[in-house]
Structures are given as C-alpha cells and as structure tokens.
C-alpha cells in the first residue's frame, strides 16, 4: 500500500508539499499540484479521512443511520442527504440497523470511532441516552424528539387526507393500521386518521403493527383479512403495508377498488408501478433528506437557524386503489 512518502518521491516533491496539497493548506504551484495528483493516481493512493480530520481538527464525515434499507422510502432520504453533503464537501458513513437496537448501538460506536462531525438518524429509538450524551450534533430524520433538531413530514394532516379520501369513496368498514407505538411520527398519522373516522361515524377497527418492515407487513395483511374479512377500506401506515394488503386482497379474489379501497403512505417509486397503482400520501423524501443535511451543517458551522424542528408538507396522490365518487 502506497504511503505519502511514496507519493512525494514519485512527484519529486517533499512530504510537506504533498500534505499541503491534500489538506488545501498553503500555496502549491499548479504544475506541482498536477504532478502530485498524477502520482496519487498512479500509486492508487487515497488519504485516510479520519487521519486528515484529526490533523486538521475538522471532520468531513457524517454518520447516516437508517432503520431498514429494504424499504425504498429510506434510500430516497439517504440520496437527498448525500447529494447535499457531497455538494458541501462532506462524505457519508452509512449504517442500516434493521430496526434492531443492538445494531444501532454498534453503528453509533462506529460513527464515534470514525470521528464524525455529526449524525443524521432515522432511528426507531430517538430517546436513547446515547443520542443525548453525544458531543457532536444529531438531526433526526423522519423521526422527532421534543427539543431535538429534526426534519419530518406532516403526518397528522397526511393521514387526515387519506381518511377523507377513503370516506369520499364510500367505504363503510375501514381498517386503520397503526404504526409502532413508540414513534411519534407514526402516532401523528394514527391520530389524524382517528379524528376524521370518528367525525364521519363509520365503522372502523385498528390493527397495531410493531414495525414498518416488509416481512411484518406480509403477516399483518393475512391477519387483517382473517380477523376482518368484511373490511372494505384500509388506511396503511406506509406503502409497504399497503402493497402487502393489496397483494393479499387480490389473492383472495377481491376487486380493487370496487370491493376494497387501499391507501398507503410515502409514495415510494414502486407505488405507481403496482397493479392497480396505489393511492397514497406523498412524503417529499428526497427533499427531507436534503433539509436534514442542511440543518446538520448549519449546526456544525454554528450558523443562525430560523428553525430546528422542520415539518414538510405532504400531498394526497389518488391512483387506482381508491374510488372517485361524486
């Protein structure tokens, strides 16, 4: 493995000159800079980012923690954050916790060992002591914690829109899928739907769900139709759950939306490709990731911030799993 001394020798310059070039610290003649870059490419030399951050006392690494990379919603968040951070000269260290506390704690330790400048966390455990005890900033993404910086969407309004749409389509026996009880964002969605359903005085029942994962969604969909076979409308906590319900409804010979209406939440890219295409509530996932990165960098750079708890608007996307009644 090549070292900085090897690069200096190949470029015909001193180690100090290579170091100035790498750290953009001090004057380096353009011709010399070109020789150093060429030598680095020839020797396949890449500087150690952690060592550079320790030397400069300024890390350019950001930790990003997601709960489930198999859910297409979360890569959209990640891409938004990554694009904004890259634009500002930062790099991501990524962790996928699989909604497991042990893995999450291990990744937090990894971030610490790599001297990250801050963390963006779409965590299932925002109230962990580890977050409040960190000596670098944390921004929660698609999650909230009172008093902590966060970027989320208006889930309360979003699922009110979903409930209004499903009632407008004349469903009378509605099943509401409630997301994990310990996540405030999931409970905002639940409470928004609850308000509208009670006002409409329609029959409805609630199924509690422990996670947003694909595996759990499949078993939940089977439970739904086993427990409530007469259900003619489903409001899901996310598009993964809605897709599982759609699949199970079709498997049982139901016509969608004639026999049952289904509305998801997130508007993942695959939602419009399902058959029939899924009606859903669109979260601006890419923009949420981007805003989380902007917020974190603002905190790192000690910039004045107008707001640290950002809530972004959502929209109802009516496709073919809901009826359009006059």
Swiss-Prot record:
Record-annotated HTH lacI-type domain positions: 1-56
One Pfam assignment: LacI
DNA-binding span(s): 4-23
GO biological process, one term: regulation of DNA-templated transcription
PROSITE patterns assigned: HTH_LACI_1 (PS00356), HTH_LACI_2 (PS50932)
Alphabetical list of InterPro entries matching this protein: HTH_LacI, LacI/GalR-like_sensor, Lambda_DNA-bd_dom_sf, Peripla_BP_I
Keyword Transcription regulation: yes
Coiled-coil boundaries: none
Cited function: Transcriptional repressor for the ribose rbsDACBK operon.
Name under which the protein is recorded: Ribose operon repressor
Species this protein is from: Bacillus subtilis (strain 168)
